[in-house]
């Protein structure tokens, strides 16, 4: 018998359809939960894509809620991060049913998903992140529930969209250029969504502890951009746990491997440290 049960539930109802989350529920829960956000250059993949890491975290006792969300080219910034905030609110509202502590919820995401979890965590209750109605949101207490999280795990995050856009142009990555254009309506919108800009302009209302992971052979996320993210976070006195992983490519953890197993252990250790610090 599997140690993890998987079920899909609707977490939000929008004008364009329902949004699903896949729940990875451990048979032996440790009472804590995390919301997972997939990558895909803001234009591809779904809640099933990061199943390897979802199963690893759930096997260790965590409830994992892996989200579908609206993305490009049919939807533009900030739709995705608004949906992610709704996903956090849903888990918080249903914490008793899901058997998780609402005060220890975290966010984890990779690549563009790493960008989106940072964006959501820094501005959880901004007006633009209150626009996706969660299921049962007719109740005022539900609709006003906070999307704040206790910590963030950002795996190879595209933290500064305009910087990565120029990098993609300079390196001839036309598919990445097209993906940026598909989700962001302009360079101004990319700049608006820059995590570094938000940190340095004091727009961030919440700066939770963060684990940032940079693979050494990442051809999609330049290391200089990630180091600038670390610096910007530290400038706000944010707690940063930075991991550089030599020899590994972008998005390696979407596939089972020893490196993925090691990363899962490191992620769990970081999460446990944040929960223990309460």
Language-model features and meaning:
Residues 1-278:
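Alpha/beta-hydrolase superfamily serine-hydrolase fold, recognizing
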């Amino acid at each position: 018998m599997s140690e993890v049960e998987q079920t899909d539930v609707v977490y939000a109802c929008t004008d364009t359809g329902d949004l699903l989350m896949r729940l990875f529920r451990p048979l032996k829960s440790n009472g804590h939960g995390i919301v997972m956000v997939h990558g895909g250059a803001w234009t591809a993949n779904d809640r099933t894509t990061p199943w390897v890491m979802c199963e690893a975290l759930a096997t260790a006792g965590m409830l994992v809620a892996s989200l579908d969300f609206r993305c490009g080219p049919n939807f533009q910034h900030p739709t995705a991060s608004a949906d992610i905030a709704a996903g956090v609110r849903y888990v918080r509202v249903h914490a008793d049913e899901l058997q998780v502590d609402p005060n220890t919820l975290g966010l984890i995401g990779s690549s563009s998903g790493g960008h989106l979890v940072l964006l959501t965590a820094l501005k959880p209750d901004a007006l633009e992140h209150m626009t996706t109605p969660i299921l049962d949101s007719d109740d005022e207490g539900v609709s006003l529930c906070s999307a704040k999280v206790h910590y963030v795990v950002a795996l190879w995050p595209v933290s500064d969209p305009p910087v990565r856009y120029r990098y993609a142009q300079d390196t001839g990555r036309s598919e990445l250029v097209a993906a940026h254009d598909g989700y962001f309506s302009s360079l101004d919108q990319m700049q608006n969504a820059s995590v570094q800009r938000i940190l340095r302009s004091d727009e961030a209302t919440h700066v939770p502890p963060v684990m940032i992971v940079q693979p050494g052979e990442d051809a999609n996320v330049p290391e200089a951009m990630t180091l600038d993210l670390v610096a910007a976070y530290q400038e706000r006195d944010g707690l940063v746990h930075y991991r550089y992983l030599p020899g590994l490519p972008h998005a390696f953890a979407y596939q089972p491997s020893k490196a993925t197993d090691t990363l899962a252990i490191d992620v769990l250790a970081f999460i446990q440290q944040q929960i223990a610090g309460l």
